Amino acid sequence: MNKRKIGLAMSLVIAAGTILGACGNSEKSSGSGEGKNKFSVAMVTDVGGVDDKSFNQSAWEGIQAFGKENGLKKGKNGYDYLQSKSDADYTTNLNKLARENFDLIYGVGYLMEDSISEIADQRKNTNFAIIDAVVDKDNVASITFKEQEGSFLVGVAAALSSKSGKIGFVGGMESELIKKFEVGFRAGVQAVNPKAVVEVKYAGGFDKADVGKATAESMYKSGVDVIYHSAGATGTGVFTEAKNLKKEDPKRDVWVIGVDKDQYAEGQVEGTDDNVTLTSMVKKVDTVVEDVTKKASDGKFPGGETLTYGLDQDGVGISPSKQNLSDDVIKAVDKWKKKIIDGLEIPATEKELKTFKAE
């Protein structure tokens, strides 16, 4: 009996020790000495910066939403970001966040593909996610979008809203990604007005508001009355030029189509009731970032996977701000949206555009 009692007592002690040990191992230390078991997340911006009113800002809003929902504080052991002033900062910033032991680190933008690949190799115990590119590594989740689908819809809106039949597209840097915006947009215009002309210009960067303004000025002077920009912070220059023209002549039809976020507020002409934002192609980076971060915090990080979001996944679309679209245009956009969700393939390259037939 005594031996049995001693054995039972020892078993209880061992069991208790095991439980305590497991608790101790699951606790993640934070610099503030509080917040055990907290998941930390951070991001590195592209050169457009965290306030670009576009995809960098949208990604940060997704991280902030996750942080606030989970009681995290901005900074180390919570949620944070580092801004890149040039592409030379990408690797340095990613490495800095990795050294600070963030659980998940985002690289925002396809230009960070090489840097994410390099740091992911060096930091195999850290999870990374890249937006708008594919990095085939077990500790990297690749997040991509069908930008051509949302761009097609705003192309339909542009073609049906334009009075001149001359439409513009301003891109940041010419690349495979931005061509998806351009080609999808042109396909949408072509689908409803084959006679419309789309003038295409690239600014050579996503942080060149002055170039965006000058490009818009040239386009509007040539008779273009709607410009779709896919240019990050460069697009603020397009808005500036449109607002200046509208302020000079309130009766003039001059429109901008925003990108990534609902940019209706960006089109407000100061001191008036006028707004030059026709609509926006929203790319729901914020929602996707929050969702992927939640999966990672739940132990379901999609490492090694490529996640693609289109209209059917509610990853892209047309903005809810439709004050400047007529009822007929909205109905047409909705009709084409249904066609795409039902299987209409929207072109993403010049080659695909040449053989595209709207149904």
UniProtKB/Swiss-Prot annotation:
Residues of the signal peptide: 1-22
Subcellular localization(s) per the UniProt record: Cell membrane; Membrane raft
Membrane-protein topology: Lipid-anchor
Reported phenotype of the disruption mutant: A null mutation does not lead to any detectable defect in guanosine uptake. However, in the nupG-nupN double mutant, guanosine uptake is reduced to an almost undetectable level.
Sites of N-palmitoyl cysteine lipidation: C23
Coiled coil region boundaries: none
Pfam families according to UniProt: Bmp
Record-level GO cellular component terms: membrane raft; plasma membrane
Lipidation (S-diacylglycerol cysteine): C23
Keywords for this protein: Cell membrane, Lipoprotein, Membrane, Palmitate, Signal
Induction: Transcriptionally regulated by CodY.
Chief place of localization: membrane
Role description: Part of an ABC transporter complex involved in the uptake of guanosine. Is probably the substrate-binding protein of the system. May be a nucleoside transporter of broad specificity but with various affinities for different substrates.
Subunit relationships: The complex is composed of two ATP-binding proteins (NupO), two transmembrane proteins (NupP and NupQ) and a solute-binding protein (NupN).
Record family assignment: Belongs to the BMP lipoprotein family.
Name of protein: ABC transporter guanosine-binding protein NupN
Source organism: Bacillus subtilis (strain 168)
Taxonomic lineage of the native organism: Bacteria, Bacillati, Bacillota, Bacilli, Bacillales
